[in-house]
Regions:
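Membrane-proximal basic amphipathic "stem/tether" segments
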Residues: 1-36, 42-43
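Conserved catalytic-core segment of nucleotide-activated headgroup transferases in glycan assembly
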Residues: 48-56, 178-258, 361
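Donor nucleotide-activated moiety binding/catalytic core segment of transferases
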Residues: 81-96, 248-285, 289-290
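Catalytic binding pocket for nucleotide-activated donors in carbohydrate/polymer assembly enzymes
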Residues: 282-351
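C-terminal alpha-helical cap of glycosyltransferases
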Residues: 355-370
Length: 370
């Protein structure tokens, strides 16, 4: 057990259960402002991709927007505490709070019932176990529910509801298959045009080539994240030769392990991708929107099943499943030439049916009626 990780968890518990509730009670002296909506995140210094569509929608509706973004992983304890205090001050009187990941301050107190917290969870589908269903995410000794104040958790399809309820320790009625707001962008021609132009500028060497994107999830927890298979992808790129441009896009927790230079997010790379290689990442579900070939490269599959586990039968998903590097090149060539379009369609309908380009509209409707 990593002693630094354990100490960090106990500090979090102290701040969440003792300090922040006092700040909240002190600040909630005014009436709740139903025209005020707070967008907050502790993993990004700027607005996360997951929030863009809803942000544009609430601005169009004339709501007062407050943004509270800071990467707590980079900040000092005092800087993070200052940011938490700023959030609690606006949280105490805001009508709505929007988050897209675990956000400790929002769960630190018994919030006012008039304030609604919307969780735009960043991942589609429900593939690997997460949250309270695995100690890798939330240790058993951690006291408090980091998601308890969420009034609405948006998911990509009705199938996801019971699994999110279990992972988040929330009643099923709070898990709503309204769709994942950010996926609306995949249906907008202007967004696709912009990302293609940005891609051309960032990757001029890809001109005239097929694009292969490797986008794995991370292993372990956010504080001790690691990746699997990077050397194999490097060797694959050499085998594929000049016909392909191979791009690596790691989870945000792992970006620091790659050379700097790639400023495009995975969501911005998907529209220009001809073939995706992933493993247990929810990006697989995003990619179903484009109905293009994919390969699941999982060299640690047996170990992952034992230590983490899944909400579904992983082996039934579309795309070639490859456990050995020896089979990776052949699988990529085969899938690129001939892939099962019907399997992709059925998988989309089961796990992504609410991601139809109108998710933000449904979320806005809920927000107005809440």
């Amino acid at each position: 057990m990593n002693i630094k990780f354990v100490i960090r968890q106990f500090i979090k518990m102290g701040v969440q259960n003792l300090f922040l509730p006092v700040v909240y009670r002190f600040c909630k002296k005014r009436h709740v402002n139903k025209n005020c909506i707070v967008f907050a995140d502790a993993h990004h210094e700027d607005m996360p991709f997951s929030m863009r569509c809803l942000y544009q929608a609430v601005k169009k509706n004339g709501m007062h927007v407050v943004m509270q973004f800071s990467d707590y992983g980079k900040g000092s304890f005092l800087d993070n505490l200052k940011n938490m205090l700023q959030f609690m001050r606006v949280y105490a009187n805001a009508g709505y709070v929007v988050v897209c990941d675990n956000f400790l301050p929002a769960a630190s107190c018994k919030k006012r019932s008039e304030t609604k917290v919307i969780q735009l969870w960043h991942g589609c589908g429900a593939l690997k176990k997460f949250g309270y269903d695995t100690p890798e995410d939330i240790p058993s000794y951690y006291k408090g529910n980091v998601l308890r104040n969420c009034d609405c958790v948006t998911v990509s399809a009705p199938w996801c509801v019971p699994y999110f309820a279990s992972a988040m320790a929330l009643p099923q009625e709070r898990i709503m298959p309204l769709g994942i707001s950010r996926t609306d962008l995949y249906y907008r021609p202007e967004f696709l045009k912009i990302v293609r132009k940005r891609f051309q500028n960032e990757y001029p060497q890809a001109a005239g080539k097929k694009v292969l994107l490797w986008a794995p999830t991370f292993r372990g927890n956010a504080a001790q994240a690691r990746v699997c298979g990077q050397e194999a992808i490097d060797r694959l790129a050499q085998k594929l030769g000049e016909e392909w441009c191979v791009i690596k896009c790691l989870h945000p927790h792992m970006r620091k392990k790659l050379p700097k230079g790639n400023c495009l997010t995975a969501e911005e790379l998907l529209p220009v991708t001809d073939l995706l290689i992933t493993d247990y990442s929810s990006i697989l579900f995003d990619y179903l929107i484009f109905q293009k070939p994919l390969v699941r490269f999982v060299p640690d599959y047996q170990e992952y099943c034992k230590n983490r586990g899944f909400y579904m039968d992983y082996e039934t998903l579309p795309g070639a499943m490859v456990e050995s590097e020896d089979d990776l090149y052949a699988a990529v060539v085969k899938e690129a030439q001939d892939y099962d379009k019907e399997a992709l369609k059925k998988t989309f309908e089961k796990y992504m049916s609410a991601c139809d380009g109108h998710a933000t509209e449904r979320i806005m409707k809920w927000l107005k009626e809440a």
